[in-house]
């Protein structure tokens, strides 16, 4: 049976959605209709939200799952009248944390995501700009400033991984696509050799690579299984020859790939 899940907040909804998605992902056999509802910051909006929740409960024949990070007590009381299974993230964790720290929390909306009070904001922007400027081997003369350089065949997940590490951790990550010439020579390009200690390889199952490339260039040599199988085989040979640590991205999320890379390379996050 498909269930409905709401991620509700009187701020951006980032925290409710992130934690909620992580928890729901543990129930792989259950399909969910997921809805994010940010800025539920007035009583009128809260009452309208209750109507949405109750309508979903009536439609589905089972109550929706509600993840919320609402700070305002009056709004929380309105939300509690809904026919939903409520998981109040702040009240669940803040109360025991207040007891442990013997201090009251500020109950500030959007505190962790604010720009003005966040010293990490410019670090994040600079890391994202670095990832974009050094994407797909477009520029190589700034590799000395890179924390990491991801290498692999085209369309194996290098770009989204670099951007995720930039946005979440302030990591300056470049990426370089290894070409058919590189593979046939079984040699790293000269520009990568001098930065060997920063290299990390991504590989992927050939059938998955074929499907991804087919969406971009259908019925082409580039997207053929034979070509994808050749490139993956040769790039893995190159990784072994050059002793480049690597991971197969096929069955991992970008979050998991990023975490594994940082652990294996021993790269410290600029912020957490």
Curated annotation (Swiss-Prot):
Alphabetized GO MF terms: ADP binding; ATP binding; phosphotransferase activity, phosphate group as acceptor; protein serine/threonine kinase activity
Record keywords, A-Z: Kinase, Nucleotide-binding, Serine/threonine-protein kinase, Transferase
Disulphide bonds in the chain: none
Q: What is its EC number?
A: 2.7.11.33, 2.7.4.28
- What catalytic activity does the UniProt entry give for this protein? [pyruvate, water dikinase] + ADP = [pyruvate, water dikinase]-phosphate + AMP + H(+); [pyruvate, water dikinase]-phosphate + phosphate + H(+) = [pyruvate, water dikinase] + diphosphate
Instruction: Name the residues that bind ADP.
Output: 152-159
Query: Is Nucleotide-binding one of the keywords UniProt gives this record?
Result: yes
Q: Which domain of life is it from?
A: Bacteria
InterPro entries reported for this sequence: Kinase-pyrophosphorylase, PSRP
Q: What class of enzyme is it?
A: transferase
Family, similarity comment: Belongs to the pyruvate, phosphate/water dikinase regulatory protein family. PSRP subfamily.
What biological function has been recorded for the protein in this entry? Bifunctional serine/threonine kinase and phosphorylase involved in the regulation of the phosphoenolpyruvate synthase (PEPS) by catalyzing its phosphorylation/dephosphorylation.
> What is this protein's record name?
Putative phosphoenolpyruvate synthase regulatory protein
Q: What organism does the record attribute this protein to?
A: Pseudomonas entomophila (strain L48)
